[in-house]
Amino acid sequence: ISKSIELINEMGFEVFTFKKLGLAINSPESSVYRYFENKHTLLIYLTSWYWKWTECRIVFATTNVESAEERLRKSINILTKPVLVDNAISYVNEVLLSEIIFSESLKTYHTKNVDKENKKGCFKAYKSVVQRVSDIILEISPNFELPHMLTSTVIEGAHEQKYFADHLPSLTDVTHGKDAITEFYTELVFNFLKK
């Protein structure tokens, strides 16, 4: 897992192969196929792992916080701020994994098989994060009709803005060293909920 994260981050998902992973871990390519049918299923696994880990971070940050507004702020921070190293999990470099999520995660569900994979539960972890944050939104504004849309827009928009800042800077107003993404999405959400 750790080497696949390193290689996908280094070379990109399109160039990454199980043959290259096998060479990197000094194991036959066929040994990787015992665990994953193809590199797409590996990406789904990594994406699901990331979202379960993110949900744990949200739960930890929001437990015992009475104010729904503060829980929402903390959740938006986790969903939009850069990931820091978590030494509690030695076999996963969360910083590199988050880079993969920003640049490659759309490839997990922008496929022809998305409906079939959804029925198998492949996106359950991501949907759980969206539901958790949507529930907080509904605590603040019980009549708000679009909590899932707002939450998924924050997540995907933040990922796009991070990607644009690194690769297509003329498409964003993000400058390195400033937390514009978190500020933007926090303001967007709370202004939207005031309506």
Enumerate the language-model features and the residues they cover.
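An amphipathic alpha-helix adjacent to DNA-recognition modules
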Residues: 1-2, 36-59
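Short, amphipathic alpha-helix enriched in basic
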Residues: 1-17
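Helix-turn-helix
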Residues: 14-41
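Amphipathic alpha-helical interaction segments
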Residues: 20, 71-74, 78, 149-156
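Hydrophobic alpha-helical connector segments
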Residues: 45, 61-95
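A short secondary-structure junction motif
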Residues: 53, 57, 86, 104, ...
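Amphipathic alpha-helical packing segments from all-alpha helical-bundle domains
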Residues: 70, 97-139
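C-terminal peripheral helix-coil segments that are non-catalytic and often amphipathic
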Residues: 127, 131-142, 152-195
